Amino acid sequence: RDAQESRGLGDVYKRQYCAKADFVFNLAGVNRPKVESEFMAGNFGFASTLLDTLKAHGNTCPVMLSSSIQATLIGRYGKSDYGKSKLAGEELFFEYSKTTGAPVLVYRFPNLFGKWCRPNYNSAVATFCNNIAHDLPIRVNDPSVVMHLVYIDDVVDELISALGGREHRNGDYCEVPVVHTITLGGIVELIRSFRQMPGTLSVPDLSDAFTKKLYSTYLSYLPEERFSYPLKMNVDDRGSFTEIIRTSDRGQFSVNISKPGVTKGQHWHHTKNEKFVVVSGHGLIPVSYTHLRAHETPEHL
């Protein structure tokens, strides 16, 4: 709001945007004020100004409010001034809908996380990812605390759906349908495992949705020089063998270089499937199947 006034945009905001908008996303808010009284002024106050301006122009377009789980004022949020200001904003929106008939979409977001979020500010996940990626210390007061997390890409998908009238509702409120529940200690353990993976050539289990999202988030904090790391090339007279990636459930990926006339392998596996992709040169790969007679050895060129 202050930025709008300082740039002379306040009048444009009130006269043009609020008059002509087809949908309003109210994502503005105050979460780190210098004094606690700014919570109410920034969260409730701005919401009041926004709705009054829409009402003055007779614009009853849908209005979305970004609220917080802290507005429940339950448990550790019971004395939250931030939560109280968000709850006041919610009540204002619901009353506005009753008096004008305008649709309101109130989202009580839990903890949000995602790529490039500002660390050491308002997100524990951002701080943990940044500090662990840079080998900085972190502090976890209670690893057993249960976190309810929503990934920012899922938030964006939901808001786009809301714009098209396909929001997910739960009673009076709207919600992002994908919420991940995990302890604080579990988050830290996962991020620390990401930090160690280049040394073991491992990759996370990306079949798990939360792990995939957290790993993507972690990578956005990784220093540029750590995107590459050395590989060990095992060299002998026959050529070389270099492991590239190891997985916990899908084997490994490697580069095998064989010199001309060299035979490698000459062993078998009872429970294993190997795939070869020839990227340069040519060779003969004989394959033996136990159900074939001894003299039957198919070969692949």
Language model feature labels by segment:
Residues 34-64, 84-92:
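NAD(P)-cofactor binding segment of oxidoreductase domains
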Residues 2-13, 291-294, 298-301:
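Single conserved hydrophobic/aromatic residue that forms the stacking wall/gate
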